[in-house]
Design a protein with these regions (language model features):
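C-terminal, well-structured catalytic/ligand-binding subdomain of enzymes
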Residues: 1-41, 46-52, 56-82, 113-335
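Intrinsically disordered, low-complexity linker/loop segments enriched in Gly/Pro
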Residues: 74-107, 112
């Protein structure tokens, strides 16, 4: 099954997941939204009933955004989820939007469809570059917060890119990558490529958040979309595995097109999800700093048991989601 992963860092640290129904002219989809987005205007990762999935990472080394229109990545992805069935539909949507004026984005968009086509689209206001998955070594593409088409300057997140590449090297080589590889591995790992060690695994008591490891204080979600196998109905079998709040301490709950786990839904005041609110409170208890000019320090001693608790809870979330999917596949095969 194809996988699309997003480890989200954002100033909008409370998120929720919800389903948006189809209309006469748009597709149904399920996506991650910022808390408070009652109109579901900006999707940050999601998939639709046709099996098209999309996410983004902000890019800081593409052409400077001088347009009055900006920060439209979530709006672009919402439109893509409403209308795109194939990966090629997404680039066609970008072509149409660019022809009308500045797109208002500086982003790496990752996307795939139910036919197995996919890749990264590094996109700025007036142009984009496609990196097809079919041409990628080992069948995987990794992006942080810079674009390969953007040159050598301002490669924000370069160390985190190296972190992810190092942590994925063995699973890719052994062809053992699963959703858990990301939510239970990379999003909980404090591996630093420059030091060649995982600080959460070698007895370190505290670590400074300097933006050089995958989890950060501003990490608000870890999400993996798992695509359909050939012949499956994506509307019935695709799953979005979602860890909200602070991913190292949180746990995974499943979201399907017609079935979203209650902990992910915006059931609290202000369109907030219970899991997000709970885990952000936990996060706040783990970080401290001397003053506003000092880096945030994470208490690894307190975090370690929470990581293990989260993994146990995630195992149950994966079990429930897979049981539901397997039942649907079984029912379809007997009809």
């Amino acid at each position: 099954r194809m996988l699309l992963w997003k480890h989200r860092d954002t100033g909008h640290q409370e998120n929720f997941v919800d389903r948006v129904a189809a209309t006469d002219s748009t597709l149904a989809y399920v996506a991650l939204f910022n808390a408070g987005d009652s109109l579901r205007r900006e999707a940050w990762i999601g998939f639709n009933e046709a099996g098209f999935a999309v996410m983004n990472t902000a890019s800081y080394n593409l052409a400077p955004d001088t347009a009055r229109v900006r920060d439209r990545e979530g709006i672009v992805m919402t439109e893509a989820l409403r209308r795109c069935r194939r990966f090629g539909d997404f680039t066609a949507l970008l072509d149409s939007a660019i022809a009308s004026g500045p797109l208002g984005v500086q982003a790496n968009f990752g996307a795939f469809d139910a036919e197995g086509d996919g890749g990264y689209v590094e996109c700025s206001d007036h142009t984009y570059t496609v990196y097809p998955l079919a041409l990628a070594p080992e069948g995987a593409i990794i992006r942080s917060n810079y674009s390969f088409s953007g040159g050598k300057e301002r490669q924000l997140g370069a160390v985190r890119q190296c972190d992810a590449e190092a942590l994925l090297a063995e699973p890719l080589r052994e062809r053992s990558v699963r959703p858990e590889t990301f939510t239970e591995g990379l999003s909980r790992s404090f591996y630093h490529a420059g030091e060649g060690r995982d600080l959460s695994a070698d007895g370190a008591m505290r670590v400074a958040d300097r933006g050089e490891m995958i989890p950060r204080r501003i990490s608000s979600a870890s999400v993996v979309i798992e695509g359909p196998l050939p012949g499956e109905n994506p509307a019935e079998t695709m799953v979005m595995w979602v860890s909200l709040g602070f991913p190292p301490a949180s746990h995974v709950e499943p979201a399907m097109l017609d079935s979203v786990a209650p902990a992910l839904l915006p059931s609290e005041p202000g369109c907030r999800a219970p899991l997000s609110s709970e885990m952000l409170s936990v996060r706040d208890s783990l970080f401290s700093r001397r003053d506003a000019s000092s880096p945030w320090m994470l208490d690894l001693t307190r975090l370690r048991p929470l990581i293990e608790d989260g993994r146990r809870a995630s195992a149950e979330g994966y079990r429930r989601g897979r049981a539901l999917r397997d039942n649907r596949i079984s029912e379809s095969s007997t009809e």
